[in-house]
């Protein structure tokens, strides 16, 4: 397999920042690396940091669910492996309204 790096880019306007998980995922897709079967999230946190502080943010979870298989493994540094669908069991879904 391939290792695709990503880095967190922040600026004064947090809404314009992007997380490393999304950078790596978008880079992999732009390079034609499909299908992607494993995602890895490494958060720079102190050894005694709570597991929740090491988890991918909600935006990254949503993007991963839209671009990866729901059964894909996500390896989270300091936490372990989880299936993607466990990280976001009820994702946002944009569906066309049903017309009766």
Language model features by range: what are they?
Residues 6-7, 69:
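Generic, low-specificity signal for short hydrophobic/alpha-helical stretches with a mild N-terminal bias
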Residues 7-23:
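Compact, glycine-rich, soluble single-domain proteins
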Residues 17, 21, 27-36:
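Active-site- and interface-proximal helix/loop "cap" or "latch" segments in soluble metabolic
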Residues 31-100:
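C-terminal binding/interaction regions
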